Amino acid sequence: MQKGGAAVRRWILPGCVLAALAAAAVLFWMGRAPGFSDVSRRDSRYPAIAGAVEAGYMQPLEDGSFAPDAPADARTVVTALLRAIGEEAEPAEEQARAHRLVLSTQTVDLDATVERRAAAGMAARALDLLSIAGESPYADCTDGYVVKLWEKEIWREEGGLFRPEDPITRGELAALACAAAGADVSAGAFRYSNYWVDPLETVPENPYDAAAFTWEGDTVAYTGGGYTALRGVDVSGYQGEIDWEAVKADGIDFAMIRVGGRFTRSGGLYDDSAFTRNIQGALDAGLRVGVYFFSQAVSAEEGLEEAAWVLERIAGYDLSMPVALDWEYLDGGEARTTGVEPEAVTDGVEAFCAAAEAAGYRAMFYCNRYCGYIKLDLRRLTAYETWFAQYDLFPDFRYTFTMWQYTSQGQVDGIDAPVDLDLYFIPD
C-alpha cells in the first residue's frame, strides 16, 4: 500500500476488521485503547492496528510508534499470521514451515521484506486455502492465492490493482492478520488432506451409483444404468512378459500401455522397456488399446515435450482407447514436483492433452483424490477424459471420470506380476 491516507482507503475492510473497529471503539470509551505516536485514532488504519496489537499479533516499536507505512520483515509477517490462526510463532522459521507459510522448496530470510503477493500466499496457506481460484479482479496480478483471499473477503483492494511486488507494510499486515483471525474459510468448502477445498461448480459431478459397484474376488463390475463398464489393465515393463491371448481370454476388454516416463529427480525422459512388445501383443490379441506416459511435468513446455515424445512413438498404431498423461505428485527429498503449485501442474497437463487431441487422439489425464482436489484445476480440463485412481469399494470422487483404476494388486491370467485393474465407462 502506498504511503498517505488516500492510498490506505484502497483497502476494503472485511467484516472481521469492522469487528476490530467495534472492539477498538469499546476499548477507546473504556480508556484502554492502545495509543501510538504516529497513528491517530482518526486514522482509518487505527482499528486494525489497535486490534492486532491488543490481540498480540503485532507489537508497537520500542519508541511507542507503530510505523504503519514501513515494510514488514518476514519474521513479523510469520509471527502475526501464526498468532492470528492461534499457533505458536517461535521458532519462527520452523513454525512457518510446519504450517506451510513457507514451502519446503523455499528459502527464507526472516530479516528481509516480504512482497504483497508472497504475504498473500503465506496468509492463504496458513488458513489451509488452495491457490485454485477464479478470475482475478486485478489487472496486475493473477496469482491464485491473491485471488483466493479476494474471494474469501480477507484481502481486497479497490482500483483494480494489487501491486504484487510491493513490500507489505506493517499497517497492511495488521489488517491482514485481523482479517485472517476472523475469517470463516470453511463456509461452502469441504475438508480434504488438511485443506479447505471450494467445490468447482463448472466441473460435472460423479454420475455413478455407489451401490451399483459389485465385487467378485478382486474384480469389480458396474451394474448401474446408463453405462457399460469395460474391464481393463494398465501395464508397464514392471509386469514382465505378458501372454496377451491369455489376458484376453480372462475377460479383459482393454489395455493401457505405458510408453515411457519422466525421471522424478533429473527430469529426463525415458522409454518403457516393454512398450513395443506390449502394444503389439495387445493389438494382436484383439484388445482395445490406449497408452499412457508417467509425467512429472511442472510447466506447459514440459507437457508439450512429453506429448511430442509419446506421439512420435505411437505413430502407426491403431489406438481405440485414450492417450493418457499419468501425472503423479511426489513430495520431499529431491523430487522435482515438491511444492509445485496447481497452476503449473495444470499447465503441463493441459498442454499435453491439447497436443494429443490436435494429433487426432482422445486425451485423458490421471489423478487420485489428492491430485484431483489439491494439485489440478479441473475447470481447465473438462474437455478431456479423467482416469481416476482410488483403491476402495467404490469411487467417491466428487467429479466425473470415465476410467476408474480400482486396485494395483490385481491378478489376471497371462500376467505373472500384480497388475493395475480398471473399469472404463461408456455411456449407453
For the regions a language model picked out, list residue spans one by one:
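Feature responds to low-complexity, polar/acidic, surface-exposed segments characteristic
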Residues: G5-Y46, E54-V147, E151-I168, A179-R191
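Substrate-binding cleft of extracellular glycoside hydrolase catalytic domains
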Residues: G225, A229-V349, E357-A358
